[in-house]
Amino acid sequence: MEKTDSTRHIAIIENCSMSAVGLQHLFAMPTLNHYQLHLFSGFEGFKKALHQTNFFSLIYSLSDAREERRNCLAHVRDLAFTHSHIQRIILASDEMEARLISHLSPSRLHGVVSKSLTLEHLQKELVVLLGETLRINDNMLNHWYRSQNRMLSPTERAIL
């Protein structure tokens, strides 16, 4: 496995090519350009790359599809068991989905960020999350999402 202390490798799973280009431009900005970006269209490609690259963080970008949301949460849970040192950040479509992901996630996440934020706020939140190396689920973003709505019942979780 590649071990490079000076370079932090960030994996982004994004199945929309236009969004992937947007994320590439975001990570080309001065505050994020010191990370080496690896784009994947699906989790299987990312799993194969895990054997060659020591990833610092996984950013899983979601659309509004329920099936994709369920698959994302299952993959992120599996990653938490097999590679607990990798940060797990989810980019949700909007604030509502971000709160939903915070409630439904079966594993601890480093952060959930809404893609509907302004570019400036999205960039700031990613800088904060990627700068926090050890504090999983101990950041203001997760606390804010969790405090916005009550926790879901087991029945509600099963339905969603």
Model-derived segments and spans:
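Helix-turn-helix DNA-binding segment
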Residues: 141-160
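N-terminal regulatory/sensing modules of transcriptional regulators
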Residues: 1-138
